[in-house]
């Protein structure tokens, strides 16, 4: 009897403990949730890209091994371009022969294989675009991707580039304030990459590039002085001041009157039928300080007896 009473007391204590514990009761009462449904997640568009929406949708639908976050960096080695061509031509190009690296040797090797494939398929990609993509020139990879899109889909797209790409940062520098623009040395360092010097160590070619950048910087400075004369304290010349103060219509009328007066030459009427002689007439033309003599036959006014 005593043992049975002890067992009943132990059962009642454990039941009371379970009722009092707040952490166990909600876990037992909560229903078991199923696995979350998988939703289709599209990769985000690359930051500050100048690709059109149709090209971005096309890249998202290709299911690439990784989506490009930085257009200039991710397309420079040619691995993603090779993967795109492998999707369209799986039996003619093997992705295993390409390497996803950042060294100059890897980039040149991948693009050399791509150039052979393009020549075999008679696809034409400008070498300037390939060169600019390898060396991460601003705005060049976007044009290359649009060319590849046109070759593979046979669709024409309207480029959204602001201006023509000249493989320099000239357009970017012109949009900056005058204080923030780079100097000549900084412009040369920014536009001639180290990879260009390593791939083409010809000193003459690099000197010509540097001279071109210096001339471009001088042109940029002259244009800045013309557009912002107050900043550079450029004083107008005497001719500019005169043209600014004179009205356009009045100055044009005065000039026409001067020209007309200078060109008028008096001619004597014919009198009688006597002998003729010659007389010098000095005429002053507008805009000239020299006189010239014109020989005019004039009949003699004296009558013969």
UniProtKB/Swiss-Prot annotation:
InterPro entries: CH_2, CH_dom, CH_dom_sf, Spermatogenesis_Ciliary_MAP. The keyword Nucleus applies. The gene is SPATA4. It holds the Pfam family CH_2. It is found in: Nucleus. The keyword Nucleus applies. Gene3D superfamilies: Calponin-like domain. GO terms for cellular component: axoneme; cytosol; nucleoplasm. Keywords: Nucleus. This is Spermatogenesis-associated protein 4. GO terms for biological process: regulation of cytoskeleton organization. Its main location: nucleus. May play a role in apoptosis regulation. Disulfide bonds: none annotated. GO terms for molecular function: microtubule binding. Residues 49-155 form the Calponin-homology (CH) domain.
